[in-house]
Amino acid sequence: MKQKWIVLIIICIGVFMSTLDGSILNIANPTIAADFKINMSQIQWVVTAYMLVVTATMLFFGKLGDKVGSNRLYTLGFFIFTIGSFLCSMSNNLSTLISSRIFQAVGASILMATGLGIVSNAFPANEKGKAIGITGAVVGIGNMSGPVIGGIILEHFGWPSIFIINIPIGIIAVFLGIKFLPKPVLDEQNKSFDIPGLLLFASCTTLILLAMNEKGNTRLYLGITALIIFLLLALREVKFEQSFIDLPLFKNRNFTVGNIIGVACYFPQMAVSFLLPFYLEQLKNLSPMMAGYVMTVHPLIMVLIAPIAGSLSDKHGAKNILTASFSFMTISLVGMALLKADSPLYLLIVCLVIFGLGLGAFSSPNNSSILADVPPQKQGYGGSFLATIRNLSFALGTAFFSSFFAQSLTYNQKFKSHTSAYVIASNQSYWIAASVCFIGLILTVFFMRKTDKSIS
């Protein structure tokens, strides 16, 4: 087997472990809360602390990987993630579990920050899309299999086992990484590190994510503080020659446009992920298990489409594939915006199939297009930047749609029945999501540069 495919397998192990860990934990949270005798507002910090650390540090580890070697850092990430998993499994109270999750999150952040750049450097230009598409499919498999595997583990072995399963996989991955990951391409031009820029960026992202978990004045104060820190960061990065934010990369049109349309894809996804389970269980009266089956429709389609979309983008360029992707997502969200309480379930499933086509056709062509404009010695930074954008978009999308839906529902209940108010609030949310996707479509059509794959 050629080394590039071994490299891809090693990266996919890390992708699978990190996505599986997150999706399993969502299922295990109620069990852990009952075991520790705590409420759900307390157990949410097991998830929130992990998300804060990952999002705030990914860009740092991406840049660090370019300087010291992404392969070394990736292997270290596996080691830290594995040790963190062991510590989580041994936790006997909430504070210990949160501390262990923070340690584990450092490893996960390294894996997410450096993995995509390693894959991009390992494959030639005409195979990058296919390779990145395979990693996208693994993300979908991890997210889909998490609830199933988690349910089996919780029923037969208890919640510590959801962390124990990471340990043997992690040990194998560490040895594979040491033996097979290629010699790194280092960024020799800039060995210095913008520590103040790093601290400002980490503080800004942390405050944004904390604000998403608060309400009222606390959210407002955190948001204002985050804005002030962002302005300070912007002023510093413009004036400082060797800045933490790699501003020269934004001169590349596809790098800039690709990250902007990333927001237009990932932000609206949360309307579906957050609101749809409530629609299925409360308005369609489906059991949680049946609702779960319905919610696997679009991830399943995504798993099937992602590698195909990656291969097509290698042959025909990313722009046409991304145009189709946003068209599918916009159409599907408009369809969801037209659903009523008594709409047949098959109409929703059709919308989810179309939505899955759009999602599956997005990530690998867009990631490939972004990284094609990034020099080999900066691939770690490029991959970590788009991963940071993705995480922030998910967090902001969840906060926005949950808040908007709740406010719309409360307002409309003054004039309508609960069911009618629910449908109105849901439809309005999907119209907003569709509008954001349509903006992504416009940006793709008019601003993304069409690459000549034959030259690549």
Curated annotation (Swiss-Prot):
Keyword Cell membrane among UniProt keywords: yes
Induction: Expression is probably regulated by riboflavin, via an FMN riboswitch.
Compartments (UniProt record): Cell membrane
Transmembrane segments: 5-25, 45-65, 78-98, 105-125, 134-154, 158-178, 192-212, 220-240, 260-280, 289-309, 321-341, 343-363, 385-405, 428-448
Keyword Transmembrane appears in the UniProt entry: yes
Gene Ontology CC terms: plasma membrane
Highest taxon of source: Bacteria
InterPro entries given in the database record: EmrB-like, MFS, MFS_dom, MFS_trans_sf
GO molecular function (one): transmembrane transporter activity
Topology in the lipid bilayer: Multi-pass membrane protein
Pfam family, one: MFS_1
Keywords per UniProt: Cell membrane, Membrane, Transmembrane, Transmembrane helix, Transport
Family, similarity comment: Belongs to the major facilitator superfamily.
Alphabetized PANTHER family for the sequence: BLR6921 PROTEIN, MAJOR FACILITATOR SUPERFAMILY MULTIDRUG TRANSPORTER MFSC
Protein role: Transports riboflavin into the cell.
Protein name: Riboflavin transporter RibZ
Lineage of origin: Bacteria, Bacillati, Bacillota, Clostridia, Peptostreptococcales
Annotated gene: ribZ
